[in-house]
């Protein structure tokens, strides 16, 4: 009777995969936007990114200079080709216009995290673009 037992375990594994809860997404709120007259074609944006416990970003890029400041909690950040870093409240992080952000997630599964990001980007360009790996 080992065969029915095997079927049960295969069925259970398939059921678990189908009902797995997807990773929580971060919430992005725009705080401020301004045209930069001294930099033709550029604008400044300030956003707040709130990460619920366990939340993570999709792989993306900004096509902008992004200056990140951690307000609350701990965030794990990694740019393509660089090691991951864990940042806590009061620490900063920089992403350049050609960087691909491969990891951006809340380091905690129980506590929220928040960052504020200042972007210097092309006027009218999206704040971020998902990247396929």
Where are the language model's segments positioned?
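Bacterial N-terminal signal peptides that target proteins for export
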Residues: 1-11
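Bacterial N-terminal signal peptides
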Residues: 9-20
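Sec/Tat signal peptide C-region and signal peptidase I cleavage site
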Residues: 21-25
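A short glycine-rich, His/Asp/Glu-containing loop-to-beta-strand
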Residues: 27-59, 118
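Short acidic-glycine-tyrosine-enriched beta hairpin
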Residues: 36-41, 51-52, 81-98
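Histidine-centered metal-chelating micro-motifs
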Residues: 56-58, 76, 93, 97-106
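Short, conserved beta-strand element in jelly-roll/cupin
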Residues: 65-77
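Ligand-binding loop in jelly-roll beta-barrel domains
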Residues: 84, 99-125
């Amino acid at each position: 009777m080992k065969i029915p037992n095997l079927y049960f375990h295969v069925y259970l594994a398939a059921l678990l995969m189908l009902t797995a809860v997807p990773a929580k997404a971060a919430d992005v709120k725009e705080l401020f936007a301004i045209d930069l007259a001294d930099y033709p074609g550029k604008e400044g944006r300030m956003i707040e990114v709130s990460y619920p416990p366990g939340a993570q970003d999709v792989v993306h890029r900004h096509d902008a200079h992004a200056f990140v400041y951690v307000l609350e909690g701990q965030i794990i950040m990694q740019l393509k080709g660089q090691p991951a870093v864990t940042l806590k409240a009061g620490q900063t992080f920089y992403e350049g216009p050609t960087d691909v952000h491969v990891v951006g997630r809340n380091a905690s599964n129980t506590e929220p995290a928040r960052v504020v990001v200042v972007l210097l980007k092309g006027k009218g360009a999206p704040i971020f673009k998902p990247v396929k790996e």
